[in-house]
Structure formats: structure tokens, C-alpha cells
């Protein structure tokens, strides 16, 4: 059979929008929309740094992106989930892995 039509969907976290940027300069608006698309592309059940290949919840993204994201989205549910992921992966000695919820040990 021949494929007659194909539709792609952009999936991301359903966080409510709490802020927006718009100005009289079209270039600034385009830059804002590009950055917002990148943030939404990396904001699912975990925060990633490159949605086309990275699927692990590297926790530094939660720290590095929080200020940028909180002015645009309500992150309360996402960050509650991230904190729960951190708690559930915490080791007996108190160490929190750099990846949560899936703990990966890289050998090499």
C-alpha cells in the first residue's frame, strides 16, 4: 500500500502557560518563538537537552532551565514529579544520581 498522508504531532508537557513575550520587533518575536519551541520540545516527563536523541532525565537541566521556564509555564506539577524522581532514586548513602528517574551507570 502507498501512504497517502502522514501527520506529525509535537508532544510535550501540558504545563499551563503563565507568561508570554511580544514586542514590535518581528525578529525578537521569532527568536522568542524559536526558544519557546525548543523549551517545549525538551519538556516532557523529564527535562532533556536535545529531544531528537536524549531521553534520560539529566537533573542539571532541571536546575539550569528552571529560571527560563518559570516565566513562561507553571512548573509546579513537573517539578513535584522531578523531586519525587530524585527521592525515589536516592541511594542508601544519601547520594542522588545525576539521572532520574532511570538510573544509568555508564561503563567505559
Question: What is each model feature region?
Answer:
Residues 2-108:
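Substrate-binding groove/exosite segments of carbohydrate-active enzymes
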